[in-house]
């Protein structure tokens, strides 16, 4: 895979992707940018959420029929000193509908361990949470 990233002045870049889409990136004002695009660190969290979301929905297959909502909240904690890389990433699935919670957990676990290329490419441990119909559900340790 290859992307072409073009400088547009100051801290602004546009990446042209093989899928045909473009992504606009910029730094925040405190890093000399204008805040006119996603920051690269935001893109990492977007990538983690998108990758695990796609994998989980693929793994659930027909079990998605009775799910009405899947929101994925991804939060990264960063080091104070340079480089201010992520030290931890927490991902919470907020799900509504009829599905066995452990079946959903199995899809999260399998997606993370076997399929999600984004999370496999990152150093920090990524942890997951599941909120099903407003209730936090722990994964069974089986």
Show which residues each predicted segment covers:
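Extended beta-strand/beta-hairpin segments
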Residues: 1-46, 57-142
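Alpha-helical metal-binding/catalytic segments enriched in His/Glu/Asp
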Residues: 48-51
């Amino acid at each position: 895979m290859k992307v072409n990233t073009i400088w547009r002045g100051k801290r602004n870049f546009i990446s042209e992707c093989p899928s045909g889409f473009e992504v606009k990136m910029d730094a925040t004002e405190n890093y000399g940018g204008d805040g006119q695009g996603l920051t690269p660190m935001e893109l990492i969290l977007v990538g983690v959420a998108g990758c695990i979301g796609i994998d989980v929905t693929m793994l659930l297959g027909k079990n998605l029929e009775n799910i009405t909502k899947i929101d994925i909240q991804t939060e990264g904690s960063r080091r104070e000193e340079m480089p201010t890389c992520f030290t931890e990433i927490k991902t919470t699935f907020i799900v509504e509908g009829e599905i066995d919670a452990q079946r959903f957990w199995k899809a999260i676990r399998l997606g993370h361990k076997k399929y999600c290329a984004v999370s496999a490419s990152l150093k920090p441990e990524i942890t997951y949470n599941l909120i099903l119909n407003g209730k936090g559900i722990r994964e069974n340790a089986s």
